[in-house]
Structure formats: structure tokens, C-alpha cells
Amino acid sequence: MSMLKNINTEKRNPRSFNLDSMSVQESVNLMIDEEYGVIEALKEQSLNIAKIVEVTSQALKKGGRIVYVGAGTSGRLGILDAVECPPTFSVDYNTIIGLIAGGEKAFIQAQEGAEDNPDFGKEDLLKINLTAKDVVIGIAASGRTPYVIGALEYANSIEATTIAISCTKQAKISSYADYNIEAVPGPEVLTGSTRLKAGTTQKLILNIISTLSMVSVGKVYQNLMVDVKPTNEKLVERSKNIICEATGVDYVTAQDFYMKANKSVKVAIVMILNDCDYEQALAILKKNNNFIKS
């Protein structure tokens, strides 16, 4: 019997046995209903997720990086999360990194066999000069991807912190990691298509890890992204609105301080809250480890 048969992500969903003969409305309703399994899976793993947020937060505070490693959908989700962090939080592109089996070209076109070689996982970590300060997060819905296992093995060998995220219980990759999340949303509507519920589950976990890790290092004030990088017109307007929300000033005043603060939302807020100039605001932030304290 194939080893895959016993993995949660490969099991058939009895509710969708007749998917090919359902009406469009029936199948739409089914796919929506099946997503409830995602939230239940996350709730069941909430303690593990919280622990991992603590781990990644500490790593960032000590100058370490978060490195996502995955193949196929899992790898693409890691990249999606990583590339959104620089514009949202003004972190360096090397702070949170997404690696995918087969390299960047695999993001848009599958690279056959790339995920089956554990050495490729190690090689990709060598290319980014992984250190013991970093955290490697291996992502594999099936919990058995050789590329991810190779990466985790190498990370362990240099004493980097390792985390495994899978969508099956007793996942193989869990045994290669210091911490693990085994969030099981149930069999897919389309058997084995882990871009569906498993992919959604993984994406939500990564959302939580990256967002709350950024909160822990002062990138958020209240629930405002005060380190947003205003790289387009929408984000420039959002920046001014954030200043208004955080300080209670009107739009014109926010716009004025935005310019005085060299287009830094965080600095503008500190200037307003502390009634100080640009240089004084920078000093206050440095003293407070880049946190805004009202």
C-alpha cells in the first residue's frame, strides 16, 4: 500500500464523492462549508502557534531572521508572506525570507523533481548564509517533503531554531524540528489538492507568525502599521490617515508632520505625541527600542 494513503491530506472527503455530478451551487456551498475546518484546525493548534510566535519574536530581537522553506504551494505561501513584510513593516528584505524548491522560477512554474532532493534544501540555506541566530520554518502540507527535511536537518546541524508546519498528524517533518504545528483541516474537496484547505490553513498560520512577530519588535502601535513604507499613492494616503488615527490631529496637520518627519509615520506620531522636533523624536524612539509609547 502506498505510504501516502495514510496521510490526512491524501484521504478522500466523503462529502465530495459526487463533486463531478453536483450543481454549481451545491459545489460552491460545499467548498465554503469545508473552510470551517480551517478555523477549527487553527484553534486546536493555538497554543503551539503562540509558542512559535514567542520564538520568532525573540529571534528577531536578537538580530536573527525568519526563513520559510517549502515546495509547491507551501513554498509560494512562504514567499507571499515574506515579500509583504518590507512594505508593511519597513523591514529589510533579508529579515523574513521565503525559499521554494526549484528557486524563484518555481513560483510561477512547477520545477519537476525539485522537492524530492533533500540536498537542495541544504544548498538553499547555504546560499543565504544561515546562522544559529536564524529560525527556519519548514512548510509541507503532507509533512514529508524531502526538500524541507533537508533544510531542517541542515538548520539543526548549525543549531538554528527549527519549526515544522504541516496539515497532518504525526508528520515526518515534525521529528526534524524543535517546534511544530500540525493543523489538520480535513480531507480536501478535491482529493489531495493541498492548495485548497491545507494552503489556506498554512497561509493563516504564516499571517499570524509574521504579523505578531512584527508587533513584538515595535512595528505596530495600537493596531496601526506605523512603520509602513509609503511606496505608492495609496500608502501615502494611508500613512497620513494613520497619523490622524494615532494622534487625533486633523488631516492637514498630519500631512504637515508627515513631511517634517521625512515621510516616516512613526517619527511623525512621536513628534506629535511628545511635542518635539524630528531629531528629538528619533532619540525617543532609540531610547524606547523603536516602540511608540504614549
From Swiss-Prot:
Pfam families: GKRP_SIS_N (PF22645). Residues 56-219 form the SIS domain. GO terms for molecular function: carbohydrate derivative binding; carbon-oxygen lyase activity; ether hydrolase activity. It catalyses: N-acetyl-D-muramate 6-phosphate + H2O = N-acetyl-D-glucosamine 6-phosphate + (R)-lactate. InterPro entries: Etherase_MurQ (IPR005488), Glucokinase_regulatory_CS (IPR005486), MURQ/GCKR (IPR040190), SIS_dom (IPR001347), SIS_dom_sf (IPR046348). Homodimer. This is N-acetylmuramic acid 6-phosphate etherase. It comes from Francisella philomiragia subsp. philomiragia (strain ATCC 25017 / CCUG 19701 / FSC 153 / O#319-036).
